[in-house]
Structures are given as structure tokens and as C-alpha cells.
A protein has these predicted regions:
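Short N-terminal segments immediately surrounding and downstream of signal-peptide cleavage
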Residues: 17-36
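Secretory-pathway/luminal and periplasmic proteins that interact with or process carbohydrate-rich
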Residues: 31-37, 105-116
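Alpha-helical segment that forms one wall of the substrate-binding/catalytic cleft
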Residues: 48, 53-110, 122-130
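Sec-dependent N-terminal signal peptides
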Residues: 3-13
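Short acidic/histidine-centered micro-motifs embedded in hydrophobic/aromatic stretches
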Residues: 3, 29, 101-105
């Protein structure tokens, strides 16, 4: 068991990230590639990656929520969030899981019914841009 854990730790590069195509797809789907303080989800989401305040808070990133309007900062928020909430998917560059967690939260892969259908629809939108 210890050897397996050690192998997994050594096999996963620290700070690995999804491919650049994932970021472009996320940006395209979330805001149509727009930049700036874009409001979405009835004013509950902000910026080019449409981040909610709770998502930003869960990321643990220092700064202010208003900084999510900046694409580079928004990417840093998503990176920090995924490394906390979906570290294996992050390390593997698993775009499907990352997209679903981004859209549906850490429990997205356990979703059922309509929520699962909505997440699959979201993933198909992301796939079109990969």
C-alpha cells in the first residue's frame, strides 16, 4: 500500500495543469471569449471564466473577488480551486472532470438525473472548443 501511494505521488507532476486548449475552451464557453468584468448567472458570476464568489473563496487565493474580472487572475483561481477540489484530475490534465467540477462543483461526478444531463451538455460545449 505504501509503495502504491509513493508511486502515485512520484508519477503525478506537482503543479501539472490541463492543456492550453482547456483554458481556451473554458473561456469560450463561459463568456464567448470576452474579457473584463462580465456579469453572468443573473449577476452571481464574474469575469471571463464566470466565477462565483464561493468558488473564488474556496480557491483560497489571496486578493479580492473583483480581480476575477482579469483573465490571468481568474485562471489562477481556477488552478487553485482544482488543485484543492480535484487534484487527481488536475495532475492528469483530465479536461472532462475539470470542466464538470468547474460547472457543477466538487461533487459533480456523483450527480444524477437532470444535473448529470446538464453537466454532460456543458462538457459537450467544452469539447467543441478543445
Amino acid at each position: 500500500m505504501k509503495r502504491t501511494f509513493l508511486f502515485l505521488c512520484l508519477a503525478m507532476p506537482l503543479g501539472a495543469a490541463p492543456p492550453e486548449s482547456f483554458w481556451r475552451a473554458l473561456h469560450a464557453v463561459e463568456s464567448g471569449g470576452k474579457l473584463g468584468p462580465i456579469k453572468g448567472d443573473k449577476g452571481a458570476a464574474l469575469g471571463p471564466l464566470q466565477l462565483h464568489k464561493a468558488y473564488w473563496q474556496d480557491s483560497g487565493l489571496k486578493g479580492s473577488y473583483s480581480q476575477c474580472a482579469d483573465l490571468a487572475y481568474a485562471r489562477a483561481v481556477v488552478s487553485a480551486y482544482m488543485q484543492r477540489k480535484a487534484p487527481l484530475a488536475w495532475a492528469a490534465g483530465d479536461c472532462r472532470t475539470l470542466a464538470m467540477v468547474h460547472n457543477g462543483g466538487p461533487q459533480a461526478l456523483k450527480a444524477e438525473g437532470q444535473k448529470q444531463a446538464n453537466l454532460e451538455t456543458y462538457w459537450k460545449k467544452i469539447q467543441k472548443h478543445l
